[in-house]
């Protein structure tokens, strides 16, 4: 370690300590040098696990993730197809970035849509879907794939979190009204004034949304999922794209493979910029393991999901380089 540390000043040869105290500062440093040269580089404490409530640690530091599931060789894409597809995918990404960079800003699109809606109020194609918040995973799922078909669950699934929070606060206020009224009437009047102010703010927000012709997902009616169109993709920045990629991979871990999921994953991966962060790398690795499980269950070469699975697998494994050398043995 001495060669990696810069010296502040020269110290003489080390001196073996004795019972006498050092007479000078230099003599003290020489004794410290003698002790430091005899300290081990690595020290391991001898812990008696019988005296503490901790299990003995295992020899391995972490559990290895599962390997890629094997499938029939005829289900795998050929190297020639992979090479041609990766070239096409790279060109598609460049065209997508070009379209996104040269597309007018969202404010201009909103103004144009508002003018069109004033001329034709019955045209529903000009409605602009309102993007959920980046952290609102639940309503991003509804935005992409729609709400549940059950009418009893629709009301609960379509309501926004802010609306639920306000309703819970109102219920708590109603349960405590009797106690608060008897204790202090002035507190009730203040609460009523605050509620009136909140209602006025909500009414103003609703009027602004009606003027902008924006689709509101807080309605109680069942909603349909949105396809990954250019209007939506051009409104996604890098941070939101990374979050949506991780969301869709997490949903794929818990649900079956569908064409709608493959469309969204393909377009989001087309927008995903390199280099990718470690968390996204880990999620992409989980995604190809999940895709390998889906592919291993396919028995028919004419299965409609097989091309989509191979496309997503090739993008993650080859384009984003998430295929380990040990995984080649399972392909």
Curated annotation (Swiss-Prot):
GO CC annotation, single: Gemini of Cajal bodies
InterPro entries referenced in this protein's UniProt entry, alphabetically: Gemin2/Brr1
Keyword Cytoplasm: yes
Keyword Cytoplasm listed: yes
Region feature (Disordered): 1-23, 101-130, 151-222
Coarse class of the protein's main subcellular location: nucleus
Localisation: Nucleus, Gem; Cytoplasm
Assigned keywords, A-Z: Coiled coil, Cytoplasm, mRNA processing, mRNA splicing, Nucleus, Spliceosome
Biased composition (Acidic residues): 11-21, 165-215
Physiological role: The SMN complex catalyzes the assembly of small nuclear ribonucleoproteins (snRNPs), the building blocks of the spliceosome, and thereby plays an important role in the splicing of cellular pre-mRNAs. Most spliceosomal snRNPs contain a common set of Sm proteins SNRPB, SNRPD1, SNRPD2, SNRPD3, SNRPE, SNRPF and SNRPG that assemble in a heptameric protein ring on the Sm site of the small nuclear RNA to form the core snRNP (Sm core). May play an essential role in spliceosomal snRNP assembly in the cytoplasm and may be required for pre-mRNA splicing in the nucleus.
PANTHER family: GEM-ASSOCIATED PROTEIN 2, GEMIN2
Protein name as catalogued: Gem-associated protein 2
Species annotation: Dictyostelium discoideum (Social amoeba)
């Amino acid at each position: 370690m001495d060669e990696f540390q810069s010296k502040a000043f020269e110290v003489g040869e080390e001196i073996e300590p004795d019972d006498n105290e050092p007479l000078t500062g230099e003599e003290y440093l020489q004794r410290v040098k003698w002790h430091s040269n005899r300290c081990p580089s690595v020290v391991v404490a001898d812990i008696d696990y019988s005296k503490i409530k901790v299990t003995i640690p295992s020899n391995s530091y972490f559990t290895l993730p599962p390997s890629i599931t094997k499938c029939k060789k005829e289900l795998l894409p050929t190297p020639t197809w992979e090479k041609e597809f990766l070239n096409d995918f790279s060109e598609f990404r460049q065209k997508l970035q070009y379209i996104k960079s040269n597309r007018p800003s969202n404010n201009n699109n909103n103004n144009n849509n508002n003018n069109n809606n004033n001329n034709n109020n019955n045209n529903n194609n000009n409605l602009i879907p309102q993007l959920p918040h980046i952290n609102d995973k639940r309503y991003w799922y509804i935005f992409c794939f729609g709400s549940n078909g059950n009418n009893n669950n629709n009301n609960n699934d379509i309501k926004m979190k802010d609306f639920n929070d306000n309703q819970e606060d109102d219920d708590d206020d109603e349960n405590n009204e009797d106690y608060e009224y008897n204790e202090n009437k002035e507190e009730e009047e203040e609460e009523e004034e605050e509620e009136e102010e909140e209602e006025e703010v909500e009414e103003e927000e609703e009027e602004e949304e009606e003027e902008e012709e924006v689709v509101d997902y807080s309605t109680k009616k069942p909603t349909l999922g949105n396809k990954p169109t250019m209007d939506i993709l051009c409104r996604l920045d890098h941070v939101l794209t990374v979050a949506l990629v991780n969301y869709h991979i997490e949903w794929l871990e818990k649900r079956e493979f569908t064409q709608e999921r493959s469309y969204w994953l393909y377009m989001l991966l087309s927008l995903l910029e390199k280099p990718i962060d470690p968390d996204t790398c880990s999620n992409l690795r989980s995604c190809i393991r999940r895709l390998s499980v889906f592919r291993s269950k396919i028995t028919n070469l004419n299965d409609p999901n097989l091309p989509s699975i191979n496309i997503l697998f090739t993008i993650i494994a080859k384009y984003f380089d998430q295929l380990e050398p040990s995984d080649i043995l399972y392909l």
